[in-house]
């Protein structure tokens, strides 16, 4: 019998490779006879580091090359951070599985200060996220927010060199890279609402590839999937990519899904919020309803200013 092989397309950053190896390990644990190979790739988002992502078209910057590998048969699946995955997929591709979520909160990282509120007036804070920027400015208008690009290691190096007083990163990435000690404090979701899908890993494949979909099925996490579907439906209704000042975070209590969302002006002068609850099977409907509530409050005007700015 021929050895069964599964090829995983992945970015080359340490965090992306961790995620790909996480999927590889889970699959080989379930299927000992399966050979899983990584196909590391460089994406546009990895190459263009001197420009804010929103300026080069935020959608799909970290996934397009991986999707091309799926379409031309160079890989069978692609592993992504869910917050980087656009809502629209190329014809023939789709999201097969969302794995169990890591801590979705943002992390406050600093060598000198313990919390966001400990920072002195005018402190320099690094983040590449418009979502984080608007919420930071809302709480601390005095802070000097500066762009910060690159992988986790690069960002930490810039902090350690003294370029910033603090930086904001996803807690999930630091935990996965075995760097939890770099987290000075977790920023609670009431202060910084996470991005849709933050902390979750998704697996994309060809929608007609039933062999692969069957292999992946045991990796799906029901709770994470419901939460992320609600968050992404909200984001999609707002036509938000991964580089917009939109936050969305859902939690599941029993069979009830609770979704909170926001859209903010970049200077923090205005933040529009909405929240609601529904049965878990109505996750995507809830996401759309929350988006409609944000739009009714003027979210579209804020987003238009961001896109046209």
Swiss-Prot record:
Cofactor(s) listed in the protein's UniProt record: dipyrromethane
CDD domains in the record: PBP2_EcHMBS_like (cd13646)
Record-linked InterPro entries: HemC, Porphobilin_deaminase_cofac_BS, Porphobilin_deaminase_N, Porphobilinogen_deaminase_C, Porphobilinogen_deaminase_C_sf
Positions of post-translational S-(dipyrrolylmethanemethyl)cysteine modification: 242
Domain of life: Bacteria
Assembly and interaction partners: Monomer.
Family: Belongs to the HMBS family.
Record protein name field: Porphobilinogen deaminase
């Amino acid at each position: 019998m021929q050895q069964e092989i599964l090829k995983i397309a992945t970015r080359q950053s340490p965090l992306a490779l961790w995620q790909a190896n996480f999927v590889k390990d889970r699959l080989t644990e379930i299927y000992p006879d399966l050979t899983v190979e990584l196909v590391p790739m460089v994406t546009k988002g990895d190459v263009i580091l001197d420009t804010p992502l929103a300026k080069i078209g935020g959608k799909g910057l970290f996934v397009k090359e991986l999707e091309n590998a799926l379409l031309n048969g160079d890989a069978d699946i692609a592993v992504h951070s869910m917050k980087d995955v656009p809502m629209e997929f190329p014809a023939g591709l789709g999201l097969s599985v969302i794995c169990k979520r890591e801590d979705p909160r943002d992390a406050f990282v600093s060598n000198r200060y313990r919390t966001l509120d400990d920072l002195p007036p005018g402190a320099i804070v690094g983040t590449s996220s418009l979502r984080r920027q608007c919420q930071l400015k809302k709480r601390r208008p005095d802070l000097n927010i500066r762009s910060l690009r690159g992988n986790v290691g690069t960002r930490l190096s810039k902090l350690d060199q003294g370029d910033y007083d603090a930086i904001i990163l996803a807690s999930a990435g630091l935990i996965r890279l075995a760097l939890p000690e770099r987290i000075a404090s977790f920023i609670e979701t009431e202060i910084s609402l996470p991005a849709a899908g933050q902390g979750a890993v998704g697996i994309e494949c060809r929608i007609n590839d039933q062999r692969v979909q069957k292999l992946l099925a045991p990796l799906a996490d029901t709770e994470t999937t419901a939460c992320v579907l609600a968050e992404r439906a909200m984001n999609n209704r707002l036509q938000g990519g991964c580089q917009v000042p939109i936050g969305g975070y859902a939690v599941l209590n029993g069979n009830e899904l609770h979704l909170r969302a926001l859209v903010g002006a970049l200077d923090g002068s205005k933040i529009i919020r909405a929240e609601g609850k529904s049965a878990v099977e109505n996750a995507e409907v809830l996401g759309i309803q929350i988006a409609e509530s944000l739009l009714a409050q003027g979210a579209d005007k804020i987003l238009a200013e961001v896109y046209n700015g």
